[in-house]
Amino acid sequence: MILNPLSESVPEPYDGERRKVITTSGRLEEQKNHEMTIRAFARFHSLHPDYRLEIFGEGSLDVRLRGLAAEEGVADAVSFEGFSPNVLDCIRTSAVFVMSSRFEGLSNSMLESLCMGVPTICTRCMGGGAEAVIVDGANGILVDIDDVEAEANAMAHLVDNSEYAKAIGLRARELRQQLSLETIGDKWLSLL
């Protein structure tokens, strides 16, 4: 399988101190399973109250998801950012990126996050996109769909173990070269 090349507009990896923020990006629809992310964040937040969750995206579940954040007691720690032209800059400096999709091909948000070196947690979802590029525990973390505890534990593991998180981020950056326009172009040319 030949993947699509990474957009040249994706910012370079960030090497500074990461913000105490978990980020996720995607339409506010059932497929993206933001409910799982909010529930996992609530569990994580009970042990890490100085962290916030930023959700980027718009959709029909906006009101329901805000209600869930309130129900879980984290409304003040969850921000719904909607559409943002600088979403990549926000993700790039975050502590962790999470994608909890129920089904997904190769998510651009996931690939961008990995290529920027952000420690990334994704679900093993139908479509297998995350499993095509993430080696669990090596360049990211995979969890089962709706396994809220596993996702919360993965968040905690990454923020509590900065050396591990840094190592995962460094290995994830290797995708940047693998997805460069030049590398992908060479793969296509070799087929012709």
Residues covered by each model-derived region:
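Carbohydrate-associated surface elements
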Residues: P5
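Conserved donor-binding/catalytic core segment of Leloir-type glycosyltransferases
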Residues: D15-K32, I38-F41, E54
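A conserved nucleotide-sugar
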Residues: H34, I38-S79, D160-Y164
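Aromatic "clamp/platform" in nucleotide-sugar-dependent glycosyltransferases that forms part
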Residues: F83, R102
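Short glycine/serine-rich donor-binding loops of glycosyltransferases
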Residues: V87, S107-M110, A130
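Short hydrophobic beta-strand element within catalytic cores of glycosyltransferases
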Residues: P119-R124
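Conserved acidic donor-binding segment of nucleotide-sugar-dependent glycosyltransferases
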Residues: C125, V135-G137, I141-V148, A156-S162
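A short, well-ordered alpha-helix in the C-terminal region of glycosyltransferases
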Residues: A150, H157, Y164-Q178, K187-S190
